[in-house]
Regions:
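Ubiquitin-like/PB1-type beta-grasp interaction modules and other compact soluble beta-rich domains
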Residues: 1-77
Length: 78
């Protein structure tokens, strides 16, 4: 069975990708699966905040039909 997910990328994660996109994934997909698919790695551009439906979630959360996933990179400065 497949599920429909809205994926939102912010800041540097958009570079060469997209801002918002509707995607279809298989049931049981987690945010970590999406992070891996996009090639987002800790050594290049580490994940700062992961939100699903405007709530903080962990990378192993099992996504559900209609979820909205937002990925924000770590931000530094001072």
């Amino acid at each position: 069975m497949n599920i429909n997910i809205t994926l939102k990328l912010f800041a540097q994660y958009r570079n060469g990708r997209f801002k918002v996109e509707q995607r279809v994934y298989k049931s049981g997909t987690t945010p970590q699966d999406i992070i891996d698919e996009l090639g987002i790695t800790e050594d290049k551009l580490p994940l700062g905040v992961l939100m699903v439906n405007s709530r903080h979630e962990k990378e192993d959360y099992v996504l559900q039909e209609g979820d909205i996933v937002a990925l924000f990179p770590k931000v530094g400065g001072g």
